[in-house]
Design a protein with these regions (language model features):
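Residue-level marker of alpha-helix boundaries and capping positions
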Residues: 8-9, 44, 82, 122-123, ...
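Conserved long hydrophobic alpha-helices within structured protein cores
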Residues: 22-33, 84, 88-97, 242
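Short, well-structured secondary-structure segments
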Residues: 30-34, 63-68, 105-108
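Active-site beta-loop-alpha junctions enriched in small/polar residues
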Residues: 6-10, 33-35, 69-72, 110-114, ...
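Active-site acidic/histidine proton-transfer and metal-coordination neighborhood
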Residues: 17, 51, 55-63, 73-173, ...
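A short acidic, helix-capping loop that chelates divalent metal ions and anchors anionic groups
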Residues: 36-41, 73-78, 113-118, 182-184, ...
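Glycine-rich, proline-tolerant flexible connector loops at the mouths of alpha/beta enzymes
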Residues: 33-54, 111-113
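Histidine-acidic metal/acid-base catalytic patches
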Residues: 1-4, 11-28, 51, 58-61, ...
Length: 280
């Protein structure tokens, strides 16, 4: 396994500064975020900037396991849905451009919606997910669906049902275990269910249970990263463990995105060592 970091927690940090900082800390890779409001927003990436970022990744010896393009697939507004689908498909095209040899970044997204809507919108979600996956499959790109607390897919069972209904090897899971930890689900339970279907991950720290919970920077809470890493390895996962800093943390008045990355690296790199898992 390798250690990565998502620029989700760095919306206003110039990409040059972000990549230099992450490489300097020792991260093995990065997930670049391309949604509106970020310095790497998809609509702002012209051909010159795309080429420049690819060269920056090479310069800093950073792998690109995933691109964060989180956009709802369940908007009832036709224009909004069209814009969301265009962004996701544009991210697929970007993944092809930013491929590193035969390593093509996955496209991470969340489904949108609310948990109680599952039965009502499942067929629509399958239809729209299938459209996206077919577009991605034609380009050899994998879509990584992320179960998310408060979203229509918020449990392992739901995301596994979606995978079965779409039935494509190009639809896998972006596994953020924090969304299950705050629901009181055990590490072994969720890892056993999802690791075999996972193409990319997110980790963060957390405190409390739904509805009284907060997401934290790795190292601020009590999440047992060593047990988690050992479980992921035991269930056959050998990809990236990527830190994601939540919007909840980013709203802090004293939030420092570079300091958050530093604490995250210290916490996770130590956990890899304590777990006896080499980063390779």
């Amino acid at each position: 396994m390798k250690l990565g970091y998502s620029t989700w927690g760095m919306p206003k940090v110039p990409v040059d500064e972000a990549l230099a900082h992450l490489a300097g800390l020792g991260f093995d890779g990065v997930e670049l975020t391309v949604i509106p409001g970020y310095t790497t927003e998809l609509s702002k990436l012209d051909a010159v900037e795309r080429s420049r970022i690819r060269q920056l990744l090479q310069k800093h010896h950073l792998m690109l396991p995933a691109i964060a393009a989180h956009s709802s697939l369940l908007s009832n507004d036709k224009e909004t849905h069209a814009a969301n689908m265009a962004r996701l498909k544009g991210a697929v095209d970007l993944a092809v451009e930013w491929a590193q040899g035969d390593i093509i970044p996955a496209i991470d997204t969340t489904p949108g919606g609310k948990p109680a809507e599952w039965d009502a919108v499942r067929d629509l979600l399958v239809e729209r997910t299938r459209e996206l996956v077919e577009y991605a499959q034609a380009r050899n790109v994998t879509i990584a669906m992320e179960p998310h607390v408060g979203a229509v897919i918020d449990t392992p069972e739901k995301v596994l049902q979606l995978l079965a209904l779409v039935d494509s090897p190009y639809l896998k899971v972006n596994f953020d275990i924090s969304h299950f930890n705050i629901q009181g689900l055990a590490i072994e339970e969720t890892v056993a269910a999802l690791a075999p279907h996972t193409v990319h991950t997110h980790v963060k720290d957390e405190r409390g249970l739904v509805p009284d919970f907060e997401f934290l920077i790795p190292g601020e809470g009590d999440f047992d990263y060593v047990t988690y890493l050992k479980a992921m390895q035991a269930h056959g996962y050998d990809g990236f463990i990527s830190v994601e800093i939540s919007i909840m943390v980013q709203r802090r008045p004293d939030y420092d995105p570079l300091a958050a990355a530093t604490l995250s690296y210290e916490t996770l790199s130590r956990a890899f060592i304590e777990a006896g898992i080499p980063r390779k």
